[in-house]
């Protein structure tokens, strides 16, 4: 994925040091766009191994309208664990449990999970119930009935509920576009963590194009990724530099193995074929 490596190189060369809500400064630029052709390949990063299982389960979690991490941790996906844990640490029920002990309680105690493992009205809630509107279902119906519409938009940015969210939406708004028999999507992402988050976001929204295209009897077209604050955390700079020394490998393919509704898809209905990658590179998330 040359587009991603070009982004990383650009931010290393042009980014300005900025403070933020976390304790780790960033190199940041404002305004950057990438475009991925989804016609014959899938944009999953090859210069390090990316957790495909986490990408798929997180997207299905969004689509279901879920906001509780129990579904994720039950399926071995731990990308959201830190946020509810930080909230739990502020509660009177906290007894110095470690993060690992917290997650074990989420897995084994349904009442505990209901009380402490919810992230608030984050992505899934907004996609499926934005002040009473099922945006995802509505936009899919609109694609079918009025494909030339310029209002094929889903927003995760709900100002009336931001304070209730564990994390304000980073990927905040997306728009579909139909041209002949192809479906494209443009994402506006207000904040992009280039090392950890952006590779996930690229793959997640590309997969969303595949799923919605399948649902609407269209073919995948393009994924356009527009970033607002595109940044590299200072503790990820060496990892990014390592990636830039690696050769991009041929991209994989994605095969959808079911004709069921997008709202009924499971992990086993989605197959990743031919994913070759360089070794995993660890980086710590900034909470």
Swiss-Prot record:
Q: Which UniProt keywords apply?
A: Cytoplasm, Methyltransferase, Nucleotide biosynthesis, Transferase
Instruction: Name its cellular compartments.
Output: Cytoplasm
* One record GO biological process: dTTP biosynthetic process
Q: Where is the active site?
A: 170
Keyword Electron transport, does the record have it? Answer: no
Q: Which residues cross the membrane?
A: none
Q: What is its main location?
A: cytoplasm
Q: Which CDD domains match?
A: TS_Pyrimidine_HMase (cd00351)
The UniProt record gives the binding positions of dUMP as: 21, 150-151, 190-193, 201, 231-233
| InterPro entries recorded | Thymidate_synth/dCMP_Mease, Thymidate_synth/dCMP_Mease_dom, Thymidate_synth/dCMP_Mease_sf, Thymidylate_synthase, Thymidylate_synthase_AS
List ligand-binding residues for (6R)-5,10-methylene-5,6,7,8-tetrahydrofolate: 51, 193, 286
| Gene Ontology CC annotation, any one | cytosol
Query: What reaction(s) does this enzyme catalyze?
Result: dUMP + (6R)-5,10-methylene-5,6,7,8-tetrahydrofolate = 7,8-dihydrofolate + dTMP
Query: Which GO MF terms are attached to this record?
Result: thymidylate synthase activity
* Associated pathway: Pyrimidine metabolism; dTTP biosynthesis
Say which family it is in.
Belongs to the thymidylate synthase family. Bacterial-type ThyA subfamily.
- Name of the protein this chain belongs to: Thymidylate synthase
Name of the gene: thyA
């Amino acid at each position: 994925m040359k587009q991603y490596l070009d982004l990383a190189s650009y931010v290393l060369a042009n980014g300005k040091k900025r403070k933020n809500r976390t304790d780790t400064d960033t190199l940041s630029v404002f305004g950057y766009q990438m475009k991925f052709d989804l016609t014959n390949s899938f944009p999953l990063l090859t210069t390090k191994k990316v957790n495909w299982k986490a990408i798929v389960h997180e997207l299905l979690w969004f689509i279901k309208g879920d906001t509780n991490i129990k579904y994720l941790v039950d399926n071995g996906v731990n990308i959201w664990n830190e946020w509810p844990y930080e909230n739990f640490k502020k509660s009177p029920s906290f007894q110095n449990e470690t993060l690992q002990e917290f997650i074990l309680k989420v897995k084994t105690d349904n009442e505990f999970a209901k009380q402490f493992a919810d992230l608030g009205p984050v992505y899934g809630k907004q996609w499926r119930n934005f002040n009473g509107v099922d945006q995802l279902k509505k936009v899919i119906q609109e694609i079918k009935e009025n494909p030339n519409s310029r209002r094929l938009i889903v927003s995760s940015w709900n100002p009336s509920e931001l304070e209730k969210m564990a994390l304000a939406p980073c990927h905040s708004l997306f728009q579909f576009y139909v041209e002949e028999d192809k479906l494209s999507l443009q994402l506006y992402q207000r904040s992009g963590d280039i090392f950890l988050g952006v590779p996930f976001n690229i793959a997640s929204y590309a997969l969303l194009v595949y799923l919605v295209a399948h649902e609407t009897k269209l073919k995948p077209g393009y994924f356009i990724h527009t970033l607002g604050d595109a940044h590299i955390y200072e503790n990820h700079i060496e990892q990014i530099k390592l990636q830039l020394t690696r050769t991009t490998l041929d991209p994989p393919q994605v095969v959808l193995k079911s004709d069921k509704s997008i709202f009924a898809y499971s992990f086993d209905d989605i197959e990743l074929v031919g994913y070759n990658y360089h070794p995993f590179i660890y980086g710590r998330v900034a909470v």
